[in-house]
Structure formats: structure tokens, C-alpha cells
Amino acid sequence: MEKKKMSLPVQIVLALILGIVVGLIFYFIGKPEITTNYFKPFGTIFVNLLKFIVVPVVLLSMIDGIISMGDMKKVGSVGWKTVAYFLVTTAAACVIGLVFANIFLNAGLFPTDLALTDGQTWDGATSANFMDTLVAIFPSNMWKSFTDANMLQVIVIALMFGGGILAAGEKGKLAQDLVSSLYSVIDRVMAFIISLSPIGVFTMMTWVVANQGPEILGHLALVLLCAYVGYIVHAIICYSVSASAFAGVSPLKFFKGAAPAMIFAFTSTSSAATIPLSKECADEMGAESDVSSFVIPLGATINMDGTAIYQCVATIFLAACCGMTLTLGQMVTIVVTATLASIGTAGTPGAGMIMLAMVLEAMNIPVDMIMLIYGIDRLFDMGRTCLNITGDISCALCVTKWESKKAAQTAK
């Protein structure tokens, strides 16, 4: 009798659990440097492989998706529905973040007696000009966009080439076949890299737990908990409910289907690196391949719901540390600023911190206060990345259903 092979999602879950256990062992015996020297390098190799494959995956999957749609009108329809979905859920994420932050604050669960030590200053970016970002979206050198892994520019390149191939008609047939062939090759390479996920998850999780143990158990634990409660509630209320209401996928089926990508995103903290798994999960739950090929890469770049919750929680906490009590009007300003900032900083390295700095400036809170939570940013990042890609999958399912209904009505 042939022995049944353990599925990749199960392997990833076991690797995650084992990584936590081994990480705790190294933390409690006081040898976290072992994980830094001997575990993290293998995790870094895995992450490097993911970064290496991200640009060709985004480029070819989006071009292939556009070609598969066969009509730029459909591309436009899918595009505006995707952006609208993300804007609405980002605004909802801000509200959820503010609600739970205020609950924790009023219950006395936030350590508001913290203060900056001498020399603690924030020297990162504090603003991002939307018009500058808009100009930067359009590449002047295609190859530089690829080498810099500028995902917004890669998406624009994909849109232009995909549209160009469709516009060329029969003369573009060779280009269509070339894209399809290259994407098949990249898909195989991608499958091999993803098969290494358990190793990457185990080594990275071991390193994180062993080195971040004090912060997890320390005085910022409740601030971290508040953000994670917000992440979970948002995933249930916005993503699973919308997938159920609009795409007919039950919450249980949705989370079970999205689990491999969620776990992978949690440990890798990279939405872009999770694109292949996110697309696979969405397709298996009923998303059309051409729609998911377009929505997932776009969402990995512009969907920042997890970041929105994080910065709302962080703003309320840091304001309390300054002795400030924010009014309802100021909280509305946070929602508007955070939602617009998610567009203005899309695709920007360190976007989470830039967005938070923008919100703090809008509230007249000293930007240097960021340093109080900067040390555990990776722990926040794990949860917010997981939430972001969950939203990408939900969006792909919803847009697929909306487009199929539209097609059915047109056919009548």
C-alpha cells in the first residue's frame, strides 16, 4: 500500500509549530545567537529565492491574466472593482483599529507611562508626496524597474504590454504564446521554491521567537495583542463575510482554503513573496485564473488593511503616552489620512512606518515617539502581512463572482 504524502499546508503548519517550540528552547536557555548564526541564514536563502521569483511572477501573471481576459474593458472593470474593494476595506480596518485601541486604552491595558530615552529619535521618512508617488509609478527604464523590484512600475509595465498584445490582435499571437510559455516555466520554478516553504518557515520562526521573546512577553505585549485582535476581527467581519456574501464561500471553507498563504505570509512578512501561494489558494476556492492573476499581484502592492489597523492602534497608544486624548474629529482624520496614505505610499519600502509617521504628524504627535514601538515592528508586521494577503484572496473571489454576474447579464 502506497504511503500517503503529507500535504504542503500540513508541512507548513508543523514547521511553524516546531519553529516556535525550538525558538522558545533557545530563548530560555539564553542562546538566541545560535539561531541567528545557524538558522536565520537558511531562512534568508529562502526569502532571497522568493524575492528572485517575485518580479517575473508579477509581470508574467498579470500579462497572462490580461491576455486571458481578452478585452481591455474587462481589465478596466476588474481593476476599478479591485481598487474600490481595497479602499472600502482599508477604511473599515481603520475604524476597527480605532475601536479596539480605545477599548484597550479605556480599560487601562496600555502601558501609557512609557517615555523616550535620551538619544531616541526617528530619522526615517515622515511624509510621502502623493504626486511624487504618482510620477514615480511610471518607469523611465524598464530594466531598472525590474532590478529595483519596484512593484508599482512592474504592474504598469504589465498593463502596457498586456494591453499592447491585445491591441496587436493576430500579429500579437507570437507574443501571447511566448508569455504563456515563459509563465509555464516560471510556474515550475515557483512550485519548486514553494516546496521549500517548510524549511523557510521553520528557520525564520525559530529565529524570530528566540530573539524577540523578551518583546513578546514584555510591557508592549498588550499593544501587540490589541493589534492582533483587530487583525482577527477584520479578517472575520470583512473578508470571510464578503467572501460568503458575494462569492458563496463559507467562512470555514475560506479560512481553510487561505490557510497555506496566511501561514506563509505570517512567517515571511512579504505580501509579494506570497503571491504564488495566494493565487493558488484563490483559484482552488473558485477564483477565475485570469482575475486572480490580475487582482493578487495588484493587492500585494496596494492593499494595506493590516497596516491601517496597526497605525490606528499605534497612534492611540503613542498619543496616550504623550498625555493626549484624541477627539472623535481627530479619529475621523486618522481614518481619512490612513486610507489616503495607503495609496500614496503603495509599493514604497518601509511603507508601514512612513504611513504611521504621516498620521502622527496629522495628529501633532511627535514623530520620534515611533521609537517606542519600532523594536517590535516585525511582530506587528507578521500579523498585518498575513491580514493583507487574506484580503487579496477574498477580493479575487468577490471580483470573480461580480464579473461572472456581469457577463451573465450581458449575455441575456
Predicted regions and their residues:
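Transmembrane helix-bundle signature of multi-pass membrane transporters/permeases
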Residues: I45, I63, T82-L87, M160, ...
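Juxtamembrane helix-boundary/capping and inter-helix hinge elements in multi-pass membrane proteins
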Residues: I67-K74, L109, A168-K173, S181, ...
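Transmembrane helix boundary and interhelical junction motifs in multipass membrane proteins
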Residues: V54-V58, S197-G200, S270-S278, A308-V313, ...
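Transmembrane alpha-helical segments and their short flanking loops
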Residues: C312-K412
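Membrane-water interface of transmembrane alpha-helices in multipass transporters/channels
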Residues: K31-Y38, G76, P214-L222, G248-A259, ...
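Signature of multi-pass transmembrane helix bundles
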Residues: E2-K3, P9-V13, I20-T35, V47-L50, ...
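Residue-level signature of catalytic and energy-coupling elements of molecular machines
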Residues: S7, F46, V75, F146, ...
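Helix-loop-helix junctions within the multi-pass membrane cores of secondary transporters/permeases
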Residues: P260-S342, A396, K406-K412
